[in-house]
Amino acid sequence: MATDWQPECLVTQNQTSLDPVGAHSDRALQNTTGNVQSYSDQLAHADITAREDQLHQLGFKYPHAPHHPQPLSAPGLHQQHVAARLHQRKLRRLHSVGPNSQSRRARSSYLKSQKYLEYRARPRRDTGKDGEPVWSDELEDAFQQALEANPPMGRRKWSERGKSYGRNELIAEYIFKLTGKRRTRKQVSSHLQVLDSFLKGDPDWERLVREASPERSSSVHGSAPAPKWRTAMEHPSASSHYGSHTHPSYHDHMRSMQPYAGDLPPPHYPLGSNMQEAAASAIHGFSFDMWVSAPQQANRLDKALHAYTRLQGDLHHPVAPPMPLEHVSGWRSSFPQLASMVDDINNPLDCDIILLEVNLELMTDFPPAGSRLGIQLDLDYGHPTAGDVLGVSQMDNWTCSTHIYEDSQKILETYHDLPKTQSTKVKPLFESSWWAKLFTQLTQEKRMAEDSGNPQAARDADDHARHFFRSLSAVQELRATPPSSRRLSTQYQGHHGDESKRMAILAWKFRQTRPGEVGTTTWRRLIPAPDRTTTNSPRPVSGVDRPPLSLDSILLNKPSHQGVYQTPQPHDLIHHPSQSHSQWPMYQSPHDNVANLFNTPGHLDFMTSISKAEDGLNDKTAVTSVLDSFSTSLAPESIPSTSLHGPSGAPVMLNVHDLPLSHPGMGYTMGHEASHYVPSQQHSVNMHDSNSVLHGFFGSNTQPLDDLSHGQASWGAHSTSIPGDVGAGSYQLPYQPEHHVPVSRESQQPHHFDGLLPSEDLMDKIVGRMSNGPSIHGAGPDASAGYDNATVDAV
């Protein structure tokens, strides 16, 4: 029977940091990159003693810098720390045996030339602004990598985001991405000249500093070849011999690890991006390990029975540069809790966001009874030189919330109070019990599938475990109360708000290693998008834009009484037939009746314009257009119908387009499917023609408006004459209040306009000025049709 984890034997995560293997365990995996395959294979078939011996051998095989006692003075401490770091970097460079380094070193034979070695052996006397040599060993290595990544481009430029960059600028940017240290374009150019002085003529050097076809470099405006490292970043699928140099530590030291389904794509960092976030970060060190200890062994990673994963790379330096959060594929679905924090505009993110990619190497069998699962998670807020800048040791009320998701669905949510730290290190909890149960369950499923004797069942169990880890993600949030918040809370006893400050967010992604791989964990910083409140956005519209006024509307505009409603100009309302049908906005019908359409109630003033200059096509429409465009269920306001009887032999020479009534001059149609404007005919205008004024009031159709509003027929043809004298017609319109109630069509009764017509003397003067010729409307003496008994509903 398979043994299970013993909960009482689980290693607490509040223990002190684990001691290294033979004082060198943190370097063992880094320096044994070439032995990853054999190391993992031997671990799978060796007992505990053999593993122990091998770890000690690895520690002696790749020794560290000697650990000198640190002096008490701060300057001496800093110098010793810097010297140790430089020595470690030299060892890493000497033991770098990754395929990319080998291929690069093999091609760059000049690096082994006597002149180059003598140059590098000289003491570095020139120092940069950061206090380090301008071209230290670290920067020199990054410089050589930048030469490979950025091919020669002559006088041409590489254009990106609207700016042009020369090769030296690209090299300087590349060096900054690898080392975090700035070197200017001039420093790169000077270094190239120095190296070219004694490496000129070497084929490998010439290949890196000069183009193959010199005649092409004379074209200033030609398109420069894309830097290989940028091409690889923009197109992860594109093959590039330098694609893996983006993260040299990760790829060089774990060459057996290949991209897998669910990996994050390589990021693309535009030039000029704010990569100084790492310098201003609060977290300066990170450590994470997960292992199994045998019952009789010490609770240490170097004595581990099995290591699920361990941190790969330097504890204080991520293996990859910071990456924008938006470049993480599917981060919103993988980290819902983080997405809610980013979207919270009231609480902008002001802490480090750490992305951890955990590769777990599962055990092939159950551990012995009494085995213990250990998880060590440390965050170091101490600055390498300044120390406890944030005052972490003075903070209280440390809390850690953990959200674990499977396929974006939350499967676990916990909250823990952390003990107050006495140093700059914080040790969050990472649910040891949950992980122990998970590993036991997965191991049990695998054993049952293997014991069944069905190879397909074993493969299915392995695929199930791999798919589970790919769909697994987690988000942790660390909060603490600064001393200033505690003082404020003490001063104001009534204040019960949340004074805690968000200190860090950890975003976890997981996968299961392939056979022969060692479980490792990498970490990098994520840069969230800028706060929405600090980014530029379009200014809101301060008001409604009104359409420009036509020239006729401006010329005909006159001061009028405040209570008079003025209709829009018809030539502003009429569309050309070729234009598409538009939906005209409906507006509240005016409460002015026909009697109030003129300036004075006593007589008609045909010489005064009743146009409203500020009304246009985009603001309001005539009442008739409202009836045409909408269903009859809308009850529009209307006025009583009128009748006109009387002969007239005068031609029509005037068209007044200041009234919103439906008539042939306006050119509307009344059918619901034909509810659009059509252009009216152009009429000869004579402002003293009273017959044309009356003709503008009333259409020539004999069909009632009630029938037209329900059918498809348009207005009838123009009538050619008006039988009878206009003056003989009798019109009456009863007085209507200013705010009248809409009346249905069935209840309307005919009325007359006698009270609205001018005096007979004025009418004689107007009629006397008319000519007897036929007009374009066919309303002259030769007209055949008339207006007898014609009834029109005025709307």
Swiss-Prot record:
Tell me which stretches of the chain form a coiled coil: none
Q: Where is the composition biased (Basic residues)?
A: 84-95
GO function terms (MF aspect):
DNA-binding transcription factor activity, RNA polymerase II-specific; RNA polymerase II cis-regulatory region sequence-specific DNA binding
Where does it reside?
A: Nucleus
Tell me, in one coarse class, where this protein mainly resides. Answer: nucleus
InterPro entries (UniProt xref) = TEA/ATTS_dom (IPR000818), TEA/ATTS_sf (IPR038096), TEC1_TEAD_TF (IPR050937)
**What turns on this gene?**
Expression is also positively regulated by stuA.
Write out the biased-composition intervals (Polar residues): 237-247
Give the GO biological process terms: conidium formation; sporulation resulting in formation of a cellular spore
Q: Which Pfam families match?
A: TEA
Segments carrying the region annotation (Disordered) are 61-116, 210-255, 528-547, 769-795
Q: Does the keyword Signal apply?
A: no
Alphabetically list the UniProt keywords. Activator, Conidiation, Nucleus, Sporulation, Transcription, Transcription regulation
Q: Mention any one GO cellular component term assigned to this protein in its UniProt record.
A: nucleus
Q: Does the keyword Nucleus apply?
A: yes
- Which residues mediate DNA binding here? 128-202
User: Tell me, what does this protein do in biology?
Assistant: BrlA, abaA and wetA are pivotal regulators of conidiophore development and conidium maturation. They act individually and together to regulate their own expression and that of numerous other sporulation-specific genes. Binds to the sequence 5'-CATTCY-3', where Y is a pyrimidine, making both major- and minor-groove contacts.
Report the PANTHER family cross-referenced here. Answer: PROTEIN SCALLOPED, TRANSCRIPTIONAL ENHANCER FACTOR TEF RELATED
Q: Which family does it belong to?
A: Belongs to the TEC1 family.
Q: What is this protein called?
A: Conidiophore development regulator abaA
Question: Whose protein is this, by species?
Answer: Penicillium rubens (strain ATCC 28089 / DSM 1075 / NRRL 1951 / Wisconsin 54-1255) (Penicillium chrysogenum)
